[in-house]
Amino acid sequence: MGINIVDTTLRDGEQKAGIALSVQDKVEIAKIISEMGVHQIEAGIPAMGGDEKISVSKIAALGLPSKIAAWNRMSTKDIDTSIECGVDIVHISSPVSDLQIKTKLEKDRKWVAENLKRTVIYALEKDCEVTVGLEDSSRADLNFLIQLCEMIFALGVKRVRYADTVGIMEPKELYSQIKKIRDKVPIDIEIHVHNDFGMAISNSFAAFKAGAKFADCTITGMGERAGNCDFLKFVKVIQELTGEKIYTGDFEDIIEKENEIKKILRLNW
């Protein structure tokens, strides 16, 4: 398969204003999303505790065809909490732009590299499948991104998430950056974009054409601020422009499944 969908409705999507999901809501949504042919479901952030940890644990226990991932900071405590939930994938995320490293972490590039290495090694030694998220990649120094990719690939990480966290990318530039990373490091790229300029689908497709093998999507494109890449529309774009069918059933079926999720989300569009 050329592109694999990572659905992040239950993590990034839930950050949409006005959305508040119960544990049962999340479990039901995960079941339906898995039926839609996605490779992976980002189920949440166990380190938040409470219902969040409960819902991730319940989803992981379902034994769905989709892999279940949990989002973590560069924290061994976060990682241990995710492992307790029984997820398939531990995703470790860090800001990588100088702006966010300084303002969000109050650290420097050296600290980020050292702590990313430390937590990745920790998770790998716990026999976890690990993916790494590079937050604010689109405002980061490309050479620094490549250095981090080389480091984590050498450690044994097979996939990295390039995140256009603030939604500033356009397709031509994103294609160029993904291509440069792929030319330097044989690591799988997962693209995570936001729709602030209305180009989430176009950017995800451009990243795919540049060699990205994973694309993050949400149901209806819901998410923080202007949202994320719309799952249904992106699947249709891939199908029509490349001939690849992410969902092997009738397309009307996937529309019905989206409508089921929209009812749970209490969305009227």
Swiss-Prot record:
<comment type="similarity">
    <text>Belongs to the alpha-IPM synthase/homocitrate synthase family.</text>
</comment>
<keyword id="KW-0535">Nitrogen fixation</keyword>
<dbReference type="InterPro" id="IPR000891">
    <property type="entry name" value="PYR_CT"/>
</dbReference>
<dbReference type="InterPro" id="IPR002034">
    <property type="entry name" value="AIPM/Hcit_synth_CS"/>
</dbReference>
<dbReference type="InterPro" id="IPR013785">
    <property type="entry name" value="Aldolase_TIM"/>
</dbReference>
<feature type="domain" description="Pyruvate carboxyltransferase">
    <location>
        <begin position="3"/>
        <end position="255"/>
    </location>
</feature>
<dbReference type="GO" id="GO:0009058">
    <property type="term" value="P:biosynthetic process"/>
</dbReference>
<dbReference type="GO" id="GO:0004410">
    <property type="term" value="F:homocitrate synthase activity"/>
</dbReference>
<dbReference type="GO" id="GO:0009399">
    <property type="term" value="P:nitrogen fixation"/>
</dbReference>
<protein>
    <recommendedName>
        <fullName>Homocitrate synthase subunit alpha</fullName>
        <ecNumber>2.3.3.14</ecNumber>
    </recommendedName>
</protein>
<keyword id="KW-0808">Transferase</keyword>
<comment type="subunit">
    <text>Heterodimer of an alpha and an omega chain.</text>
</comment>
<dbReference type="Pfam" id="PF00682">
    <property type="entry name" value="HMGL-like"/>
</dbReference>
<dbReference type="GO" id="GO:0019752">
    <property type="term" value="P:carboxylic acid metabolic process"/>
</dbReference>
<comment type="function">
    <text>This protein is a Fe-Mo-cofactor biosynthetic component.</text>
</comment>
